[in-house]
């Protein structure tokens, strides 16, 4: 593994660059997935995703292509995200669903806040969502020793009887995974006794260090649950009655609409305003836009295959399912950059337009939108120019937010990604070309985040929700990297994010006052070490110790 920074790059860096160039071509980015297994492999295996690294942008790109990121480990860590928590978020977002957490009752402690949240997010989309309905099998010491499959059977039947849900998502947590409970056999046994499809989710926290593996777990469970994605033949459509004198006209109208229809795949981190902004841009090109799968009903999923193209708004979230639809139904898909900021939005819309032969129309639209945005950002740019920002969260959001920060004249002091793989190389190559060789960590550890911020001394942070409190305790004001309450996507989102940065920098008293009255739980000796002191490569050496 290469540990030198750009200033001391070894001679074999050229070879690594050639590997990177080959790996980032779309033709090379093919997933080798077996959709017939009980559960999917973790992303450390399928995508060589790394969860621990310290260095700079060029090091991360090179080592991602070489597969070295997956070899890094920590000799010390605090808590980290659990893939079960991520899996339940998607389950809650499916209209009229029920989630069953098979495990001790404490595994559901983080889910109470989702009740109001899911209803609100649904209403923002014009949909009446039920409460976040979930059961726990509440395994006791006795069941942990003797098995809890009977409790799971009872919970499934009770959930189906009480709610008649659209789907029942069954989460396999750590304890039953360790003792060997067979949820697949239980679900197979009960399929004929329930009205709801039963979706197995093998998501114990210890199973994957890359918590985004949970997205693959959910989509794998959905495709195994028996939902119908088969295209509906014309003859089965009532409007397409062969005896109808307008039969041929209606079929042609349908075929034309389908040829201009795209499916966009959302996430809980993508708000209704984000969806509206992207819909506005794509419908201006004459395209028909639909959103799946979150905040939709499983009955609607049958129409997924009635489209010309699938598009991931965040491929970290949806690539697994899009690959399944491609292999099973020959549906093409593209993976454009998440549309935050002018550069990423132009790339997102242009790539979709190219598929439909609409590049010229897209260029005219985007030129006009960018001119309006540039004028709106001018006064903001004058006030925030030169201010230092650190950005942390999922790598697609982090990278595009960094390009937006540069667009308004800010200096990106550092980036901190929860994980990283080669699917980010095209974006991060643009970051290196535009922003320079920025210090970049791969970390989900609060201790490393605090150390990094102490050394970089940013004026402001853009943080994954829930982590801004660490910034504010350090005296650094923070705004959210994403939120359902605001717009982030497209040109409207670029302006709103820039405006929030401007307003936050104008008054930093809250974070300053908080830092004067809060003592963080870390020793001064920790701040004297590199933030990546505990991240080692397979030879036992610290990775990227001179990055900051």
Task: Label the predicted regions.
Residues 2-548:
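An N-terminal assembly and electron-transfer interface module characteristic of large anaerobic redox
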């Amino acid at each position: 593994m290469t540990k030198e920074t750009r200033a001391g790059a070894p001679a074999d860096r050229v070879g690594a660059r050639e590997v990177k160039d080959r790996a980032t071509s779309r033709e090379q980015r093919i997933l080798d997935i077996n959709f017939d297994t009980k559960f999917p492999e973790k992303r450390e295996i399928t995508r060589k995703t790394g969860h621990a690294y310290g260095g700079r942008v060029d090091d991360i790109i090179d080592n991602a292509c070489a597969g070295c990121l997956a070899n890094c480990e920590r000799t010390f860590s605090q808590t980290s995200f659990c893939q079960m928590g991520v899996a339940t978020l998607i389950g809650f977002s499916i209209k009229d669903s029920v989630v069953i957490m098979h495990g001790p009752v404490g595994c559901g402690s983080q889910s109470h806040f989702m009740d109001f949240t899911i209803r609100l997010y649904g209403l923002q989309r014009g949909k009446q969502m039920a409460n976040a309905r979930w059961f726990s099998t509440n395994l006791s010491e006795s069941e942990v020793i003797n098995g809890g499959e009977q409790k799971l059977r009872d919970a499934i039947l009770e959930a189906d009887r009480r709610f008649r849900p659209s789907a029942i998502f069954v989460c396999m947590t750590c304890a039953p995974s360790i003792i060997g409970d067979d949820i697949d056999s239980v679900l197979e046994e009960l399929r004929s006794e329930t009205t709801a499809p039963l979706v197995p989710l093998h998501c114990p926290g210890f199973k994957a260090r890359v918590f985004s593996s949970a997205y693959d777990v959910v989509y794998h469970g959905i495709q195994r649950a028996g939902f119908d994605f088969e295209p509906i033949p014309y003859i089965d459509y009532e409007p397409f009655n062969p005896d109808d004198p307008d039969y041929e006209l209606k079929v042609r109208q349908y075929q034309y609409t389908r040829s201009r229809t795209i499916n966009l795949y959302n996430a809980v981190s993508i708000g209704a305003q984000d969806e509206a902004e992207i819909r506005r841009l794509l419908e201006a090109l004459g395209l028909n836009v639909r959103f799946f799968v979150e905040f939709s009903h499983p009955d609607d999923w049958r129409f997924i295959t009635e489209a010309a193209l699938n598009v991931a708004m965040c491929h970290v979230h949806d690539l697994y399912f899009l690959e399944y639809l491609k292999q099973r139904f020959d549906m093409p898909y593209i993976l454009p950059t998440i549309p935050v900021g002018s550069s990423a939005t132009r790339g997102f819309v242009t790539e979709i337009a190219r598929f439909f032969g609409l590049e010229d129309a897209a260029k005219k639209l985007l030129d006009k939108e960018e001119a309006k945005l540039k004028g709106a950002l001018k006064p903001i740019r004058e006030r925030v120019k030169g201010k230092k920002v650190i950005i942390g969260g999922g790598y697609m959001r982090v990278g595009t937010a960094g390009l937006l920060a540069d667009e308004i004249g800010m200096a990106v002091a550092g980036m901190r990604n929860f994980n990283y793989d080669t699917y980010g190389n095209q974006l991060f190559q643009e970051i290196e070309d535009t922003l320079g060789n920025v210090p970049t960590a791969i970390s989900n550890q609060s201790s490393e985040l605090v150390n990094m911020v102490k050394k970089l001394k940013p004026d402001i942070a853009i943080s994954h929700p829930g982590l801004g409190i660490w910034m504010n305790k350090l005296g650094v004001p923070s705004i959210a990297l994403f939120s359902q309450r605001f717009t982030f996507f497209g040109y409207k989102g670029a302006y709103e994010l820039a405006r929030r940065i401007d307003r936050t920098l104008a008054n930093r008293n809250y974070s300053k006052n908080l830092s004067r009255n809060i003592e963080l739980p870390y020793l001064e000796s920790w701040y004297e070490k590199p933030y990546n002191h505990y991240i080692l490569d397979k030879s036992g050496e610290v990775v990227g110790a001179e990055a900051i």
